Amino acid sequence: VKAYIFPGQGAQFVGMGKDLYERSEEARQLFEKANEILGFRITDIMFSGTDEDLKQTKVTQPAIFLHSVILAKVLGDDFKPEMAAGHSLGEFSALVSAGALSFEDGLHLVAARANAMQKACEIQPSTMAAILGLDDFTVEDVCHKLTDVVVPANYNCPGQLVISGTIAGIDAACEKLTAAGAKRALKLNVGGAFHSPLMEAARVELEHAIVHTEIKEPVCPIYQNIDAKPYTDPEKIKHNLIAQLTGPVRWTQTVQHMLEDGATSFTEVGPGNVLQGLVKKVDRAVPTSSATLPE
């Protein structure tokens, strides 16, 4: 069973998607349509902008989404998912690629999500940190006992958990987790506390947009971040997409569930190979690859 996985924020690089634009007429048309929908030339920033420009949430999220969904489209018959999942933002890419969301609706939602998240970040200074070398329970326990808002945000792979919270909370958590034996507690260069209760304002804003968007049944089950289970029912998919903004990305469990349900290979669709590395940390033996255009 072929599993397809779609990356989230952090996978971006200048030059991403340029080969697609140059090699495929279909890709060119979709990129130009995206420039129109967004109201700015995102292709200029993706292909030849600065890291600084590309790193803004409102650019990064649509950029990664576009790279993933346009690549899946251009692959045509070579893209036949039997199960799919996306990390955070990647969940939207997975849904478009699996036919549950139209390209236009997906892009509108991703742009709305990015803007809502950027606004929520400006309300209260907040951040995230990667905690390496501790078990999930220890990290959960330390976060739970702090008075500031700090929560597990991304369960990336065994021994790698990203936490999210107020700046004071993250500082306190990093100190306590280092004392508890973490190999590293690394503050991340992100705009804010994604996947935490601090994103509540963004969740409310996005809920309105998602409720009014048509979601169809996908061609294959989508394993969603919020509980790592497979879904095909459009109403449940919507509910989970809304919950995702303030809840954790359960990536370790997602990979485990896909393996239990018969995944024999994982293909990453989009920029970078971060997710392949995370899959290997769950199961060293399973084959992983990046989706590429035929030569």
Q: Which residues does each PLM region occupy?
A:
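FabD-like malonyl-/acyl-CoA
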Residues: V1-T138, R184, L188, S265-P294
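Alpha/beta catalytic cores of group-transfer enzymes, especially the acyltransferase/condensing modules
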Residues: Q9-A11, L38, A98-G247
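Charged catalytic carboxylate motif
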Residues: E26, H67, G169, E205, ...
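Non-catalytic positions within long, well-ordered alpha-helices that form the structural scaffold/packing
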Residues: G76, T178, L259-G262
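A short, acidic, amphipathic alpha-helical segment used as a generic capping/interface helix at domain edges
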Residues: P248-A263
